[in-house]
């Protein structure tokens, strides 16, 4: 991976991390299109640059992160399912990351679900998140272990299924991203070093640049998304996912197979 490729992936991460379109899925597809080698460092990079994106949440919602202990306990309750299932199925998840077709199908199916959810829970207005709601949202988030599903999309749908207002569901999804992505990054780094890999000077620089770019882009993306969501809902994202999924499948089966090198 070179610096230009790293910046491209970081921009994609910053834009898509908090949108219900799957950042991991988009980075897998981008890697296939741009011929980015799907080596161990690339896998590490796509996880670690999420730190830059989640830092934007801490900056934008700084005061919200220093409220009551109740806030942290609810995040912990929502985070537990991801910890348990992530440890149990991490190897199978890594295998799915090798398949752009999995991403395409997930985009398509997820888009249909997003359209339905936006219709079903269009008038939801609750803002209070109980411990039970937090746990259920955490369960929904685990569905996003399948590439292309979207972590933010799954957790937002989980929130709306609990009658939360769109913006409340989206903001809790942002907050939940912090422990989830931090945990995923720490585990990925541990596995990387456990397997005997050592970062080179260039790789460290690439990670730093990637995180900075992802942070700056995510700042703008979150502000834009919340404003758009409160007025327009999820339909545009649902249609985008459906179109993207169909186009990718057509390309794969009729033009050129989408593969990771």
From Swiss-Prot:
GO terms for cellular component: plasma membrane. The chain crosses the membrane at residues 1-21, 41-61, 69-89, 95-115, 129-149, 169-186, 206-226, 241-261. Its main location: membrane. It is an enzyme of class 3 (hydrolase). One of its GO terms (molecular function) is undecaprenyl-diphosphatase activity. It is a multi-pass membrane protein. The keyword Ion transport does not apply. Keywords: Antibiotic resistance, Cell inner membrane, Cell membrane, Cell shape, Cell wall biogenesis/degradation, Hydrolase, Membrane, Peptidoglycan synthesis, Transmembrane, Transmembrane helix. GO terms for biological process: cell wall organization; peptidoglycan biosynthetic process; regulation of cell shape; response to antibiotic. The keyword Transmembrane helix applies. This is Undecaprenyl-diphosphatase. It comes from Flavobacterium psychrophilum (strain ATCC 49511 / DSM 21280 / CIP 103535 / JIP02/86). The lineage of its organism: Bacteria, Pseudomonadati, Bacteroidota, Flavobacteriia, Flavobacteriales.
């Amino acid at each position: 991976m070179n610096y230009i490729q790293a910046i491209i992936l970081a921009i994609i991460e910053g834009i898509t991390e908090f949108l219900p379109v799957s950042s991991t899925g988009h980075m897998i597809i981008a890697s296939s299109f741009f011929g980015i080698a799907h080596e161990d460092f690339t896998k590490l990079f796509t996880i670690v640059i999420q730190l830059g994106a989640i830092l934007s949440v801490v900056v934008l919602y700084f005061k919200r992160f220093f409220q009551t202990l109740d806030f942290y306990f609810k995040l912990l309750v929502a985070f537990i399912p991801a910890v348990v299932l992530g440890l149990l199925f991490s190897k199978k998840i890594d295998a799915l990351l090798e398949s752009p077709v999995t991403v395409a199908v997930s985009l398509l199916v997820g888009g249909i679900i997003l359209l339905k959810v936006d219709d079903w829970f269009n008038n939801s207005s609750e803002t209070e998140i109980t411990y039970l709601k937090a746990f259920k949202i955490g369960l929904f988030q685990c569905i996003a272990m399948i590439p292309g599903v979207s972590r933010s999309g799954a957790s937002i749908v989980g929130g709306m299924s609990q009658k939360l207002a769109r913006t409340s569901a989206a903001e809790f999804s942002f907050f939940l991203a912090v422990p989830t992505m931090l945990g995923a990054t720490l585990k990925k780094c541990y596995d990387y070093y456990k397997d005997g890999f050592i970062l080179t000077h260039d790789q460290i620089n690439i990670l730093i640049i990637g995180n900075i770019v992802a942070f700056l882009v995510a700042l703008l993306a979150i502000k834009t998304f919340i404003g758009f969501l409160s007025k327009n809902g999820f339909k545009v994202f649902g249609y985008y996912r459906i179109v993207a999924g169909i186009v990718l499948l057509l390309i794969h089966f009729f033009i050129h197979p989408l593969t990771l090198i």
